[in-house]
Amino acid sequence: MHLLLHGIDNARIEHGDALRSPHLVERGRLMRFDIVVGQLPFGRDEWRRDAAESDRFNRFWRGVPPKDRGDYAFISHMIETAVEARGRVGVIVPHGVLFRSGAEGRIRTQLIEDNLLDLVLGLPPSLLHHTPIPTAVLVFDKSRPRRPQPCTGDTPHATRASGGVLFIDASEDFEYGSPRNQLTEEQLSRIVRTYHNYQHVDRFARVVTAQELINNDCNLSIARYIDAHEHQSDVDPATLERDIATLETELARVRREMAQCLTALSDHTQR
């Protein structure tokens, strides 16, 4: 439907279950693509885990997700349909995908250790038509080096080459709307520019080393790595006391004036 609405009518469209029986297959193998994009089917609790354990395309070799959580099954499918050494994957996910443990945590760890994860982008709430919850975008890039070089004194900051992952927190950078919020062109440009530069931006973006992610059990919760809130600077106690004394003096003056006004008003009404 989205393709037709945007005037793209030369696409091959297949209707079916991509996990149980993918249709984009040639000569018994999954078709591969340079760009794979999608949005997880939120709220799908049952995805036929039993079929995945005997998957003929071996898409779940990093691990099989739990039967009541198919998110990483779709992510694994998308990654396996991206061209080796150059394919990229972009997927919209609920935040639980970033931090749930168990089988999902093990798959997430494997993706990080394979140096595939390129971006974790936090989006505002109520951005999508069908859900008010905040979501995130994960980008995987198969062109990243399989054996990243650790950060050294010459390159102290994390990069793609050293296995770094860019985190962007755009969850509070949006325009309120009804029934859904929106990202303006300026806000979108800021996200794209930050991703292109792949550098730290105060309270907005940070490149996190793979080792830090591993130390945090590969938890990708954005708030762990970016503090988007502006902190108050240290306050001098003596200055604070003077300010309070000044305000109290001003408050006493205002109260006296109010009492005088009320007295005058009372005298006037009694005449």
What are the language-model segments listed below?
Residues 15, 20-22, 27-271:
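A conserved structural/catalytic subdomain of Rossmann-like adenosyl-cofactor enzymes
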Residues 1-23:
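SAM-dependent nucleic-acid methyltransferase catalytic core
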